[in-house]
Amino acid sequence: MLKLVKMFSDGSCLGNPGSGGYGTILRYKLHEKILTSGFFLTTNNRMELMGVICGLESLKESCIVEITIDSQYVKQGITNWIATWEKKKWKTTKKKLIKNLDLWLRINAVIKNHHITWFWVKAHMGHLENERCDKIARQSAQSPSVKDFFYENNFYQNKNL
């Protein structure tokens, strides 16, 4: 029988682009784990994606995962756009690579290991876990320690993709 894990995640960026961070809470029964990291130069959407990716990648076995986020970009991307992107070899209608391709490839790989239900909440409306994740993400953005290699090195303009 698969374990039920509840995940809450949020991303933050001080300036966009700017220093950023994510905060993710994983909850299994009475156990809770907090994941966070701060990046020197990134975007808000990348941090929203990173929070979910790192949460899912930290799970050691297949689980039923209920993910609560405030990012329409992530929710729409994963529930509506990703199948089309994959069919079109990750290109937009203008034949350009989608933004944040490195992260969409990671999330696309990791979601296949789990049974996921996605929940969206409006940001800054008092949802307890979303507010906690927002605070954690902002704190990490204020003290970055990691380089967002793909973003900082213009990964998307590299012809050797």
Curated annotation (Swiss-Prot):
It catalyses: Endonucleolytic cleavage to 5'-phosphomonoester. It is found in: Cytoplasm. Mg(2+) 1 binds at residues 10, 48, 70. GO terms for biological process: DNA replication, removal of RNA primer. Binds 1 Mg(2+) ion per subunit. May bind a second metal ion at a regulatory site, or after substrate binding. Keywords: Cytoplasm, Endonuclease, Hydrolase, Magnesium, Metal-binding, Nuclease. Pfam families: RNase_H (PF00075). GO terms for molecular function: magnesium ion binding; nucleic acid binding; RNA-DNA hybrid ribonuclease activity. Its cofactor is Mg(2+). Residues 1-142 form the RNase H type-1 domain. InterPro entries: RNase_H, RNaseH-like_sf, RNaseH_domain, RNaseH_sf, RNaseHI. It is an enzyme of class 3 (hydrolase). Its EC number is 3.1.26.4. CDD domains: RNase_HI_prokaryote_like. One of its GO terms (cellular component) is cytoplasm. Mg(2+) 2 binds at residues 10, 134. Belongs to the RNase H family. Endonuclease that specifically degrades the RNA of RNA-DNA hybrids. Monomer. This is Ribonuclease H.
